[in-house]
Amino acid sequence: MITNSKMENKILDEFDEEELNKLKINSNNKESTTTTTSTTTTTTTTTSTSGEESDDEHTGSSSSTAAMELHRYKISQECPVDFEDDYDEESSSFDEEDEDSAAESNGGNGKLIPNPNDKKKKRSSKSSSKSSKSKSKSKNKETTANPVQNCQLMESGTLFSPTEFVKSSTVNPSKSPVQPIKLSSMLGLSELGTSNVLTVQNPQPISEPLKNDISSGSSSSSSSNNNNSNSNSNGNCNSDSTKSKFTSLNSWDAPPLANVLPDPSYCQDIVDSENNFIVPSVKHTILDVDNLFNNLIQNTNNNNNNDFKSSTMIGKPFSSGGDGSTSPLISGLSSSSIIPNGNGSLAEQQQQQQQSIPESEIPIDIKVLQLSGSRMFFNRELSELIYFYRILYEAYNPTYPILERVRFIAITSQNLDMYFCKRALKLRLGYISTRKTLKPEEHYINMVLNTTRNLINEIYNIYMNILAPELSNNNVFIIKYSDLTEPEKIQLRGFFLQHVFPLMTPLVVDAGHPFPNLSNLSLNIAVLLKHDEDTTRFVRIKVPQRIPRFVHIKQRSNYSIIPMEEIILANLDTLFPNTKILTKSLFRVSRHNDLKLSGEDQANDLLELIKTELHKRKFAPMVRLEVSHNMPAEILDMLKTQLALDAYDVYVINGPLGLQDLFELCKLNLPHLKFQPWVPHIPSRLVNLAKYPSEDVFSVIRKGELLVNLPYLSFNSSVQFFIESAVKDPKVLAIKIAIYRTNSNSQLIRALCEAASHKEVMVLVDLKASGDEEQNTKFARLLEQAGCHVSYGLVGLKTHAKIAMVVREEENGLREYLNISTGNYNASTSDVYADICLFSCDPDLGEDMCNLFNYLTGYSRVSSFKKLLIAPMNMRSTLIQLIDNEAKNAREGKDATINAVMNGLDDKRLVNALYQASIAGVKITLVVRGRCRILPGIKGISENIKVISILGRFLEHSRIYCFHNNGKPKAYIASADWLHRNLKRRVEVMVPVDDANNIKQLYEIINVYCNDSNAWEMLSDGRYKKRSSPIDEDSQTQFMNQTNQKHPVIWSK
């Protein structure tokens, strides 16, 4: 058995010197540490509410941190995980922290979060080399570069408290479909101690509990009695078969809930006095913004040990003494000043009188120095989850048709599924945002777990309390099997036997039949059978995924819909004749599907490597188990054991599992319950091409750049028409295009295959587009077989650029015609994604594009580009220069503005540059749909920054970046957001828009966004607030009205 000390030696090079010393001290002085921790816990819990964790980041046993490291090391060896790649914004994307910014700011010597796949190499090094590494790291720490020059924001401190964020739940506990369960440990480590026991939202089973499981009785008993009346309709087994032999999922801290009823007062906690929503809650403040500025000064010592001295500084910077004491940064602040706790408020036991410093007396250099303390970054996980909250609350909007509101429920559920599949395992391993933030790390994981469970609470409350009754009011009924008449049951039984029964495959689990492999996000039925007096068998049945989830009963006058699982559960006797069915319940599993693509640089065929990795995903670790409320505890325990899951991975749901399948309801032929259909229009400059045969799309582009705003203008009449014209034009000699995602029945792929017979066609297909890997591999094979030159891009980088080039022979020689877009070449999503694309034949852009394609296909070395900005080459540095130029103009008293539209913002260098520009006086407006880690509106730092988020019937997917440039505006469109992964781990393209009319159009688009009455405004503590009074009509409606006026011709096939 490997001891703790031996394990520490094995992973010696994974931690810096300070952390190693802490681990060794913890191992050698457990008794002393435990005593100290116990005292800390006792003190800090005075400010905590019952059942919640303490706010203090140091609460908990120190030995638990060492235990976490050992446990995490063990899991990482069993399951290598890719900690660099993430799924994309087209799939509600996520990515990780800017983990290597620390290394970049310290000349490449910064300490990164360890990748478990690198441990074998590191363990092979000699102990002497390890010692020299530690000395080198220590030296580099002492010679950290000037933080003002580096402009790097580092991750540190505990800005967000798990306890406080739990309070943001807007669910009425007495009426919520999910109820709390207490966990005694995290990550399967019993030694984590009682300080880590927390209350998380987990629902109570409805089935009748045994008498000895009921703690006190009246409320639980009455609730369970009420539940019995609905047991059969919910697929429960007969009461006589379960009452005495099977244990329900115990009565937990709250009585079970039989039915979720509409609650008129449900929304009150998320509505302020002006009746507008605030996410996560009106009553909750994530950050103590009033004290944040002074707190930044107080905590500079936690992150900066440098010799920087400003000429305008009052006093000296913090310097840490050997005893841990500090010297003041500014005169008047003593080393005994109050230290803020985890959520930015002042620890109750440390409250003292503090001398505040007027903001006007704090010089700009001090403000910039404070930024390196990194408490100005909103938490990455919370930012993503609050984005899900904003999507979810669109389902509240009473002005939306009911089926569109149901669609937002499905979108939120789908996003949450992807979150678990991409992030959950990484969180469990402890590699995301934990090493440099909350300690012990369990607190951070608990916070995210509580937030996801609260979000699930919200999803089911909105669906069951609000939307389901409203669907019924609109004659759309989602019924249960027990609601059917006998003739309808007979008819559905015939339907089942003819269309479903042949697809069913019961799989028993016994000595001769191992536990079956479960596919990701599959819905399954757990059945317990009894063949004779002594033998019981567990059988798993997968609900077929190739048949609809909902069945429409057309005999009824209204829309009556029954879930497929209800039909299967009611007809299980046809699968098990002459067998007694003891219990039947539903469960759904989620697997980690972001495994590392190992050996990419050594693979002979990337296509075959992708196929191998896709196969491995079918056996990836489980990360979540959702079960129906009526599942017996014995079955649940068996599933947890077989799937290697713990209690906090289980979600017991009092409602339908897999709400993302509600997308099927949105396809019902009920136009009066949906948005009025929008038919895209033809760009006015392309309307006359059909009337005048001498005209073609290339002659239109030669007259000037063409900017197309999708989906208001037609993708088919612009982008698709451009490619198809190139295929048919005999003067076109070559077509080159990069495809990241496209639709399954792509006309574009067919056109390229046709062109390959008589033209040079080069197609770059990114095989690593998350979620579309399998489809892209099929397209790659199809294109190769048609004669196209197919490339898979650069090793180690995704090719996310959306670019196409047509080479045409003309009188003056060859000319390149280009299309550069912010969105994919996907006709299916082009109708619902808001994107911008540019058509141009600029010679400089053409030369740049030729060089770029040669770089992508032939690894040719390109020293520079004339106009194009390419990530990871020069895009980030150019953006920082553009931001710094605005800051310089503002300091000189000139007008300076930055307007940007994007999907997400988390790159620390860009955030830091924006903070400094704000301090300089630049007016900054950011339209960020999703994750945003900048904090706007903080006096003296970001008061010139405004952040809004727009959600609506179309998904805002554009990337537009505009800079005032002293009255000579510079405008760009790009495939990249201001996310670290886009700027460092992908091939992205940003192109300048030169035409004055097009620049004006981009500014008009941004102006419409800023006046959107449906926008969410980001508050300075990270929450979002819905605008209370309409400034103007919502932006998407205004774009549709403008399109009707400027481009009156509607596209038709």
From Swiss-Prot:
Its EC number is 2.7.4.1. The active site is at H800 (phosphohistidine intermediate). InterPro entries: PP_kinase (IPR003414), PP_kinase_C_1 (IPR041108), PP_kinase_middle (IPR024953), PP_kinase_middle_dom_sf (IPR036830), PPK_C_dom2 (IPR025200), PPK_N_dom (IPR025198), PPK_N_dom_sf (IPR036832). Residues 143-155, 1036-1046 have a biased composition (Polar residues). Optimum temperature is 37 degrees Celsius. Residues 81-102 have a biased composition (Acidic residues). One of its GO terms (biological process) is polyphosphate biosynthetic process. Keywords: ATP-binding, Cell cycle, Cell division, Kinase, Nucleotide-binding, Phagocytosis, Phosphoprotein, Sporulation, Transferase. It catalyses: [phosphate](n) + ATP = [phosphate](n+1) + ADP. It is found in: Vesicle. Residues 23-155, 200-245, 302-328, 1027-1053 are annotated as: Disordered. It is an enzyme of class 2 (transferase). It comes from the Eukaryota. One of its GO terms (molecular function) is polyphosphate kinase activity. Pfam families: PP_kinase, PP_kinase_C, PP_kinase_C_1, PP_kinase_N. NCBIfam families: poly_P_kin, PRK05443.2-2. Hexamer. May form higher oligomeric structures in the presence of ATP. Catalyzes the reversible transfer of the terminal phosphate of ATP to form a long-chain polyphosphate (polyP). Produces polyP in a broad range of chain lengths (50-300 Pi residues). Involved in development (growth and fruiting body formation), sporulation, phagocytosis, cell division and the late stages of cytokinesis. Belongs to the polyphosphate kinase 1 (PPK1) family. This is Polyphosphate kinase. It comes from Dictyostelium discoideum (Social amoeba).
